[in-house]
Design a protein with these regions (language model features):
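Short juxta-domain linker segments that transition from a proline/glycine-rich
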Residues: 1-274
């Protein structure tokens, strides 16, 4: 147990075995042996490791069996493997603490997540996603106006939302997964607000549309369309832009961005789609 925890904490900290060894005052070989479970650190070394990794001693003894499944990433192809592992380790740590609190409090944070019953069993074209997005809003009693706080909305519906810092450019937006059968959405805490909102809506699309998309529909394209439709429903796009436009003024898009929390580029895509 300690070995797995040590490796996870080291990965979150972004340290190599040698770097951690220097901070904790032990050899890199000792760190490797601890992580492989070949030897156990003494109490003094464990305290030094906790200090170097900025975690509490209890972290190394936390018992939590976590299974992350059906992961859907929004990342760039050139994202370093080391950074990806760091994100996953941080996410696992946060989810474990979330689930641990549920166990301690002996009560769930919210009602279990459930996809709206009226969603279509099979989506055969992207235009169906316009109505699907409205169905979700209506089922969740959100109306069709701008949604101020998506994170609150998602958490109230049983989705665990995790923010993780990643400032190495824009190589990572987020991902969705199932953690012990609970839906999880992870977003980049360093991204701009409108980008975070789109990622949240996009990943909601993955959670809802998985196994519903017909043959020939690309899941990423479908989730992008759903995200735009969820953030700004079709009736309000037509109301704001009209049924036919050949030009969009930047100032107009800027005002709509601030009202709806959808980027100017996102509004351009909404206009093109409709």
């Amino acid at each position: 147990m300690i070995g797995e925890r040590l490796k996870q904490a080291r990965t979150v900290a972004g340290l190599t075995t040698r770097e951690l060894a220097e901070k904790a005052g032990v050899s890199a070989m000792a760190i490797s042996k601890y992580e492989r479970g070949e030897t156990a650190p003494s109490s003094r070394v464990l305290m030094d490791l906790a200090k170097a990794l900025e975690v509490r001693i209890e972290y190394f003894f936390r018992q939590a069996e976590l299974s992350l499944e059906r992961m859907s990433y929004r990342k760039h192809r050139d994202m370093p493997v080391k950074e990806e592992r760091k994100i996953l380790a941080d996410v696992r740590d946060q989810i474990e603490r979330w689930l641990e609190l549920e166990t301690i409090l002996k009560t769930p944070w919210s009602t279990p997540f459930k996809a709206p019953d009226k969603l279509p069993d099979r989506v055969t074209n992207l235009d169906q996603l316009e109505d699907a997005a409205i169905t979700v809003r209506e089922t969740w009693e959100l109306g069709l106006n701008p949604i101020p706080d998506l994170i609150d909305v998602f958490e109230e519906r049983g989705i665990i939302v995790i923010t993780t810092p990643f400032d190495a450019g824009q190589k990572f937006d987020g991902f969705s997964a199932k953690a012990n059968d609970k839906p999880v959405i992870v977003i980049n805490d360093s991204a701009y607000g409108d980008r975070q909102r789109f990622t949240l809506a996009h990943e909601l699309g993955h959670l809802l549309l998985k196994d519903r998309l017909g043959r020939g529909l690309d899941e990423e394209v479908a989730c992008n369309r759903f995200a735009g439709a969820f953030l700004v429903p079709k009736p309000y796009v037509l109301k704001a832009l009209g049924n036919r436009r050949t030009w969009l003024e930047p100032q107009e898009l800027m005002l709509l961005k601030h009202e709806w929390g959808l980027s100017m580029g996102g509004w351009t895509y909404r206009a093109r789609d409709l």
